[in-house]
């Protein structure tokens, strides 16, 4: 996929395909704006969390408000908030949430797709991509759309992205 517009179209189509539930990390709220109403009309439980409005430890906030929502079929949670969501501390907390999902601590009665839309600071030393290597054999899949995950290009090389991780994810890169 050549650019941001094409990547976002792909992500919108993937969400509207309605395959299970979705956790969508969407800093600018672009995917939420294009899909949430359509999903509501299709009977989805739609939750929108603007992380800029949360206080304290986001992991605790998530556990209190959203931890058990994915046991319902047809659920989508959008995490938006362009300022705070790109913070390394918050990325680390989202990594803990992903850990809980992959370790079976959250009740997933159906397939969950994790989508990351343009998460520009993802690669900065956080082990979030490493967690995705454990995705095979779970009810979770991932679609990543971010320039920081450009696979193995010299000026953009990210040593945390092994072939195993890239093979387990559908990676869309901007050029």
Regions found by a protein language model. Give the residues of each.
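P-loop NTPase motor domains
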Residues: 1-144, 149-157, 161-170
């Amino acid at each position: 996929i050549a650019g941001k517009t094409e990547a976002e179209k792909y992500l919108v189509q993937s969400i509207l395909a309605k395959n299970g539930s979705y956790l969508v990390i969407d800093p600018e709220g672009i995917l939420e704006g294009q899909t949430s109403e359509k999903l509501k009309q299709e009977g989805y439980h739609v939750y929108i969390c603007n992380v800029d409005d949360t206080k304290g430890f986001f992991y605790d906030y998530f556990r209190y408000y959203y931890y058990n929502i994915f046991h319902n079929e047809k659920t989508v949670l959008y995490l938006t908030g362009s300022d705070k969501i790109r913070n390394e501390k918050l990325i680390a907390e989202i990594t803990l949430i992903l850990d809980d999902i992959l370790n079976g601590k959250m009740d997933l009665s159906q397939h969950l797709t994790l989508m990351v839309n343009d998460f520009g600071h993802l690669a900065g030393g956080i082990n979030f991509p490493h967690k995705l290597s454990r995705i095979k054999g779970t009810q979770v899949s991932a679609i990543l759309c971010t320039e920081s995950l450009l696979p193995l290009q010299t000026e953009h090389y990210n040593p945390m992205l092994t072939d195993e991780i890239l093979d387990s994810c559908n990676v869309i890169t901007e050029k």
